[in-house]
């Protein structure tokens, strides 16, 4: 199972770290994409087997699960550029983004989608 996480900020980074430290998905099966090379370098130093990229389109190409962890106001533009395939599962952690909006932003009404509301400890 391959997981791609779009966005490596507080939430995306926490999800990537949690998955990599767990037993279900190894770091080698996780790809993280973010425009900040500094953040990506930090993740890669922690988990050398994790693939880190700045190109979202390339990042999702081999994924089974695509976790989008960007700010709600960025969701439309981020999802519009992703070449999602029918077999891929889309997971949104953006607060306030509805299923109807996800369908609109992806133009894929048959896409399997989940909305999560995770919480990280402060």
For each feature predicted by the language model, list its residue ranges.
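NAD(P)+-binding Rossmann beta1-loop-alpha1 motif at the extreme N-terminus of oxidoreductases
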Residues: 1-54, 58, 62
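Rossmann-like NAD(P)(H) cofactor-binding subdomain of soluble oxidoreductases
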Residues: 37, 56-61, 65-122
């Amino acid at each position: 199972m391959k997981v791609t996480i779009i966005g490596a900020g507080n939430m995306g980074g926490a999800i990537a770290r949690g998955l990599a430290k767990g037993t279900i998905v190894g770091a080698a099966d996780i790809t993280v994409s973010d425009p900040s090379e500094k953040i990506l370098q930090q993740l890669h130093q922690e988990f050398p087997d994790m693939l880190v990229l700045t190109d979202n389109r390339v990042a999702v190409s081999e994924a089974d699960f695509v976790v989008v962890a960007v700010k709600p106001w960025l969701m439309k533009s981020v999802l519009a550029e992703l070449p999602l395939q029918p077999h891929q599962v889309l997971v949104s952690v953006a607060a306030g983004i509805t299923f109807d909006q996800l369908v609109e932003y992806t133009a894929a009404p048959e896409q399997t989608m989940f909305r999560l509301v995770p919480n990280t400890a402060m």
